[in-house]
């Protein structure tokens, strides 16, 4: 007789990872000046050991990731991205929008005139 094997669902694993990362980020945040600091947990307590191991594992990872993405947050790189986006997509938008609206209006009027019976609309050239 075989016992049923319970497998951890991927969602449960993902939730656990998110919880650990959120906890690590919360521990990384600085305490505002003037606020009383909580008493430090002894390193020998179970949660103190978990905290130290998680911090030991995640601190280099967070630092390395922060250093790798520093170029993105640099004002020059971000300004260059915005300038390129403007040049590629937004330059001349006003004139393009006016031309599109003018063409759409002419097309719509032409279609409406073609649908209108001659008796009601008459000929535009006759007065």
Swiss-Prot record:
Its main location: secreted. InterPro entries: APOC4 (IPR028120). It is found in: Secreted. GO terms for cellular component: high-density lipoprotein particle; very-low-density lipoprotein particle. One of its GO terms (biological process) is lipid transport. Residues 1-27 form the signal peptide. PANTHER family: APOLIPOPROTEIN C-IV. May participate in lipoprotein metabolism. Belongs to the apolipoprotein C4 family. This is Apolipoprotein C-IV.
């Amino acid at each position: 007789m075989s016992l049923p094997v319970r497998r951890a669902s991927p969602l449960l694993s993902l939730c656990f990872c998110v919880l650990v990362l959120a906890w690590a980020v919360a521990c990384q945040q600085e305490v505002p000046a003037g606020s009383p600091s909580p008493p430090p947990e002894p390193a020998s307590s179970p949660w103190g050991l978990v905290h130290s191991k998680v911090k030991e594992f995640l601190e280099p990872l967070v630092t390395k990731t922060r250093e790798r993405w520093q170029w993105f947050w640099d004002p020059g790189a971000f300004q260059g991205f915005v300038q390129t986006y403007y040049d590629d997509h937004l330059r001349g938008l006003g004139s393009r929008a006016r031309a599109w609206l003018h063409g759409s209006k002419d097309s719509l009027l032409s279609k409406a005139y073609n649908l209108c019976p001659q008796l009601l609309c008459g000929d535009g050239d006759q007065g």
